[in-house]
């Protein structure tokens, strides 16, 4: 059984054959930490979490290195910090913590390495210097730009001609560039900006462009060539297109990533998610509604990862009903560990066909209810748990699932928020949180050592 993945670069489904089976390398574009993650961001994380699990199953955990970056320097971050009147580091640290809480809620494993852009400025400068030395980049008006026309096969990933690619794309500082399509590698500091948003470089105080960050961090931890590069379909152009161009030009013998995997868009009630439309939904919003993380994870896996996925109340309700059905199917059965069924694994090995994998779990659940022998019931129930666990689901006992109206992660998050409020003598907020939990029949008990424990009424 071989893993097949759709490669955007070749536009074909290919057998996954890493360059070194003992050192499989995957890079995924992580969050820009300026605001709380929305469910569209989360789809990407859940998809590549599943791919990580599949690759570990094939090659072993020690053989797989999964790098997912944190972009913690960006114009959006600077603008957001200024609008909130807070230090940029306070903002990025806060949003990064929220991202980790959200991904734990969704049952995602941590990557092997999670580098921050601000901690890799030296590598970015090294690559930019290489590009300048090889006439792929130039300095003008205190900026460093990449010369797009110098890059061979620039349009290979997007499979569009150059004019089409840039239609409707906002191009800044076009008067100072050789070509309007050239993109920034390094930009100078602006007047009155906070000191901690800019860095020393051979071209003066400034900061990197967005695209160079991922090239630098993938090079640092995975080398010139690696196996998989993942991200949302919206990143194909310009971000991933520019990554390939600058990395291959900086390292002429490099092919950069071999397999390019892209997940589809997420809409809300048939419309593109947008703050202006008022349909912008964060993971925190779902947590506040006490929607269990497993429900959201199953919803995000319910459609094939390359297809669009629409968020709506019915889809979430359907995911909840499916999980209820699975948990009911294992009632009072002493489940045992069984091998992952071959048809289930075949579905995942076929370009992560999660709709088929979910159908197979449903078939095992049906099998429990129509089984004629206890041995058959036990096998079907065990297969449900084994398959669901593999894709990051059914991590609770049946009792926990049906008797926990509120997620433990969410309870502890509120308790920590309440403790912080008490330290700040914000008694109104502390009482509000206590009452909020009390409505869910959660009783708090403050201890003499300044900790708080909880129990269900």
UniProtKB/Swiss-Prot annotation:
Motif 'KMSKS' region in this chain: 272-276
GO terms, molecular function: ATP binding; cysteine-tRNA ligase activity; zinc ion binding
Keyword Cytoplasm applies: yes
Amino acids binding Zn(2+): 29, 214, 239, 243
Source species, domain of life: Bacteria
Manner of cofactor binding, per the entry note: Binds 1 zinc ion per subunit.
Localization (cell): Cytoplasm
Protein name: Cysteine--tRNA ligase
């Amino acid at each position: 059984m071989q893993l097949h993945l759709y490669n955007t670069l070749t536009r074909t489904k290919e057998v996954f054959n890493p360059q070194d089976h003992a050192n499989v390398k995957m890079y995924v574009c992580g969050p820009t930490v300026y605001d709380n993650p929305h469910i569209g961001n989360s789809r990407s994380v859940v998809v590549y979490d599943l791919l990580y699990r599949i690759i570990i199953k094939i090659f072993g955990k020690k053989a797989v290195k999964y790098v997912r970056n944190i972009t913690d320097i960006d114009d959006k971050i600077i603008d957001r910090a200024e609008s909130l009147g807070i230090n940029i580091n306070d903002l990025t640290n806060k949003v990064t913590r929220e991202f980790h809480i959200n991904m734990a809620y969704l049952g995602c494993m941590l990557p092997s390495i999670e580098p921050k852009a601000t901690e890799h400025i030296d590598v970015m400068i090294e690559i930019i210097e290489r590009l300048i030395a090889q006439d792929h980049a130039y300095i003008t008006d205190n900026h460093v730009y990449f010369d797009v026309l110098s890059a061979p096969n620039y349009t290979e990933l997007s499979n569009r001609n150059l004019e089409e690619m840039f239609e409707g794309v906002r191009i800044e500082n076009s008067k100072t560039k050789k070509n309007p399509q050239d993109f920034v590698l390094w930009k100078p500091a602006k007047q009155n900006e906070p000191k901690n948003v800019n860095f020393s470089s051979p071209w003066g105080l400034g900061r990197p462009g967005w695209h160079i960050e991922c090239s630098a961090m993938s090079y640092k931890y995975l080398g010139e060539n690696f196996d998989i590069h993942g991200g949302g379909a919206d990143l194909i152009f310009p971000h991933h297109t520019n990554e390939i161009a600058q990395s291959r030009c900086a390292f002429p013998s490099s092919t950069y990533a071999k397999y390019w995997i892209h997940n589809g868009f997420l809409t809300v009630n048939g419309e593109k998610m947008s703050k202006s439309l008022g349909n912008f939904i964060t993971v925190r919003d779902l947590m506040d509604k006490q929607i269990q993380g497993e429900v959201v994870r199953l919803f995000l896996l319910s459609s094939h990862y390359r297809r669009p996925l629409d968020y709506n109340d019915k889809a979430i309700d359907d995911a909840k009903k499916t999980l209820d059905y699975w948990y009911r199917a294992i009632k009072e059965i002493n489940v045992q560990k069984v091998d992952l069924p071959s048809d289930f694994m075949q579905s995942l090995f076929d370009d992560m066909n999660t709709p088929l994998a979910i159908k197979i779990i449903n078939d095992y659940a049906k099998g429990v209810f129509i089984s004629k022998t206890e041995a058959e019931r036990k096998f079907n129930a065990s297969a449900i748990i084994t398959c669901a666990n593999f894709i990051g689901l059914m991590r609770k006992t049946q009792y926990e699932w049906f008797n926990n109206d509120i997620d433990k992660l969410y309870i502890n998050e509120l308790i920590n928020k309440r403790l912080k409020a008490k330290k700040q003598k914000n008694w109104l907020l502390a009482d509000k949180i206590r009452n909020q939990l009390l409505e869910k029949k959660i009783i708090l008990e403050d201890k003499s050592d300044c900790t708080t424990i909880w129990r269900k009424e």
